[in-house]
Amino acid sequence: MEPPIPQSVPLTPSSVMVQPLLDSRTAHSRLQHPLTILPIDQMKTSHVENDYIDNPGLAPPSGPKRTRGGAPELAPTPARCDQDVTHHWISFSGRPSSVSSSSSTSSDQRLLDHMAPPPVADQASPRAVRIQPKAIHCKPLDLKGPAGPPELDKHFLLCEACGKCKCKECASPRTLPSCWVCNQECLCSAQTLVNYGTCMCLVQGIFYHCTNEDDEGSCADHPCSCSRSNCCARWSFMGALSLVLPCLLCYLPATGCVKLAQRGYDRLRRPGCRCKHTNSVICKAAAGDAKASRPDKPF
């Protein structure tokens, strides 16, 4: 604001007063009108409240004017332009401008955007997860359905006569031990030793190559059998050959000894029933009842 003119300075009628120019920050639209230089005697008293030459604080308060009807009329408040703060959307031309209103709206929007607080990124989560949660080991669901009754013991069928197990594993006969030798090419057993010791393997080879295709298997495997075909021819050939190879006469006694050894070994090693003419079985008692060896009801 321009300092007010001191009252003590004398003014002459011929003095010419120039209206002070606005600040360099005044809008360009206000400077478009030419300034008129007036003499001091032509100045009116309505300019006493000029904001540019008088102090607004020293001006006396203007009371409300009264109209003819007696109702008080409020005096319009003079618009004062702040020299320090100048808004670019205020128009000094006095005509409405659409450009000024649009720029004012955009300026207000930018002002609100700057005044708004910055968004908080982690507002939803109070703190970041730094420790991986431990995996919960759940037991797999049993989709097989309800568990059935426990399996019965395979040795629960007992013979009524001897009280031994009647299952196939326990009741099957036990054979003499045997093994394969010479890179799994030769079977070493009691019966094989008898065949090679009495030269019966030579007779089996002759029967394998000289008999018909239908009978070669039975004659070669069982050369001394009386129920096979060509029984007389086989026995006649073995009798004539025993004159040259007398060891063939030891074949039958040696085979009998193997049968006896097989029966004795089976009696010692077979844990199950050896009864031949009985089919009656009984059910084994429960595992918890150790004293009861036989149930009351056979079937």
UniProtKB/Swiss-Prot annotation:
Subcellular location, in the record's words? Answer: Cytoplasm; Cell projection, Ruffle membrane
State any GO BP term from the record.
negative regulation of substrate adhesion-dependent cell spreading
| Coiled-coil blocks | none
Q: Which residues carry this modification: N-acetylmethionine?
A: 1
Query: Which superkingdom heads the taxonomic lineage of this protein's source?
Result: Eukaryota
Disordered, as annotated region: 50-79, 92-127
Listed GO MF terms: protein kinase inhibitor activity
Q: Which InterPro entries match?
A: Sprouty, Sprouty_domain
Predominant localisation class: cytoplasm
GO terms for CC? cytoplasm; cytosol; ruffle membrane
- Where does this protein have compositionally biased stretches of type Low complexity? 92-107
Q: State the annotated membrane topology for this chain.
A: Peripheral membrane protein
- Identify the keywords attached in UniProt to this record, alphabetized: Acetylation, Cell membrane, Cell projection, Cytoplasm, Developmental protein, Membrane, Phosphoprotein
Modification Phosphoserine occurs at: 125
Identify the residues that the record assigns to the SPR domain, covering every copy: 166-273
Assembly information from the UniProt record:
Interacts (via C-terminus) with TESK1 (via both C- and N-termini); the interaction inhibits TESK1 kinase activity. Interacts with RAF1. Interacts with CAV1 (via C-terminus).
The entry's family comment says:
Belongs to the sprouty family.
Functional note: Suppresses the insulin receptor and EGFR-transduced MAPK signaling pathway, but does not inhibit MAPK activation by a constitutively active mutant Ras. Probably impairs the formation of GTP-Ras. Inhibits Ras-independent, but not Ras-dependent, activation of RAF1. Represses integrin-mediated cell spreading via inhibition of TESK1-mediated phosphorylation of cofilin.
The written remark on domains in the entry is:
The Cys-rich domain is responsible for the localization of the protein to the membrane ruffles.
Q: Which PANTHER family match?
A: PROTEIN SPROUTY HOMOLOG 4, SPROUTY
- List the protein's name: Protein sprouty homolog 4
Annotated source species: Bos taurus (Bovine)
